[in-house]
Amino acid sequence: VTPSIPILTIVGLFGLVSCGEKTFPVSTSGNLELLGQYALDIPEPSGLSLSEDRRSLWMVSDKNGIVYQTDLQGKVLKQFATGLRDLEGITTIDGETVAVLAERTREIVVFSKDGKLLGRGKIGLPGDDNNGPEGLSYDPLTREFVVVNEVEGLLIRMDSEFRETSREVLRFAQDYSSITVDAEKDQLWVLSDLSGSIYLLTKQLEMLTSYSTNIRQMEGITMDHENKLMYVVSDPMARLYVLRFDDR
């Protein structure tokens, strides 16, 4: 499949925000439209997942190790502490369960939505620094976790018992900040902060298209394919961005 690589449209789009809230200009490619941007009361948000019912979002902070559930504009609804350091990803497993990615310990840790520890497993990556796994998603079709390594571009799949089932290398971006499985279309979305791009791939890692934006230090992405909505979080800006995408 020949990918469609759009040209970045340098237009300041301010989006729909609460009255009186400061906004920041955002540029996007023509197949991506900014709908809104919202300040988050979450320090260094890193990782993002849409709830199973599409009514809320899950986020983690890599500063305080807390998991947050928010509404679709980023207002905190509930939270729980994990006791973990340097959280970099979160994924919804089902309506009652989420999993987080601990970068330094190279672990996937599963919690109930109320914060009860349910299980944990090691990822087969060496080291204990902050150049490890950066993105986490759950594929309900195969019942596998999908992990992406930030620098090397390793994409690792693990089953529900945390056993590695496959390992592949991504080579199309400067780094790999986040990943999310689109179960509705059986596709993958990969976020690259340094490349300023979001990539849509088949499960066989063939690129279908890409989207460009200058959102600063993007650290998490999740999709609502039914409504053609993309949610992105920025770590240093502590902001949630809502965008509409065109994948035709």
What spans do the regions from the language model cover?
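Structural motif
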Residues: 66-68, 107-109, 154-157, 197-200, ...
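C-terminal motif of bacterial Sec signal peptides marking the signal peptidase cleavage site
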Residues: 17-18
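Short loop/turn segments that connect beta-strands within beta-propeller blades
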Residues: 71-75, 112-116, 159-163, 201-206, ...
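Conserved beta-strand positions in repeat-built beta-propeller and related beta-rich domains
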Residues: 41, 51, 58-63, 99-106, ...
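Beta-rich, blade/repeat-based domains predominating
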Residues: 40-53, 83-95, 126-141, 172-186, ...
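A short helix->beta-strand "capping" segment at the edge of beta-propeller domains
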Residues: 24-43
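Blade-level signature of beta-propeller repeat domains, shared across WD40, Kelch, NHL, RCC1
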Residues: 224-248
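A short beta-strand motif characteristic of beta-propeller blades
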Residues: 33-39, 75-81, 118-127, 163-170, ...
